[in-house]
Amino acid sequence: MTREWQSAEHAAAYLERADRVPHRSAGETTLVDEIPAIVHRVLDLGSGDGRLLDLVLRARPDARGVALDFSPPMLEQLNIRFASSPRVEIANHDLERPLPDLGTFDAVVSSFAIHHVPHERKRQLYEEIWTVLESGGVFCNLEHVASVSPGAHERFLGAMGITAADEDPSNKLLDMETQLRWLREIGFADVDCYWKWRELALLVGRKR
């Protein structure tokens, strides 16, 4: 990913914006609801401060989690959040590189992270996620996607209370339909957008 994520200032600004995302909790709740009641291992890609993985593990008390991130400020936040949790393993990894060998998982989740990698890498990553999922596993990606038009994007910025000058320079937004098509082509089943608010969408696929 881009070097912005090495900056504590950039990471702090991102987390502050993320905390103010309208309806974010609705998307997170829908994501957690799509995870089977019994899961043993959950992989969180681009974990940030660990908010999503924390929600998942609270809802699925028998699960253990692996949190992947490469930003030093985010890794620091992860270590603070999960300092006393034996259920979480933290791994330093850049999503622009192939996933490390971490075994297989019953669920792979991500929240506002994959849109920071180039489009070609997005598809490669989706293929790698398919490979590490157990049969019956689910991939849930709460993601920032491209708007259908410049006008829709402007309205999204307005709803967020920001201007074009405030946009994250590391964003590499891709439309939702392309990503759903990729998931289907890779072999995921029941692929759909399970929740959406403007440019924020929950993309879900299952491995049968």
Kindly give the residue locations of the regions a language model identified.
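Class I SAM-dependent methyltransferase SAM/SAH-binding core
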Residues: L43, D49-R97
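A short acidic, Gly/Pro-enriched loop at the edge of an enzyme's catalytic core
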Residues: P100-V108
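C-terminal alpha-helical "lid/dimerization" subdomain adjacent to the S-adenosyl-L-methionine
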Residues: L142-I186, V191-C193
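Residues lining the SAM
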Residues: S110-I114, L142
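A short glycine-rich, Lys/Arg-flanked "PGG" loop and its adjoining helix->strand segment in the class I
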Residues: R123-S135
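Core SAM-dependent methyltransferase catalytic element
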Residues: A189-R208
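Conserved class I S-adenosyl-L-methionine
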Residues: M1-A37, R51-L52
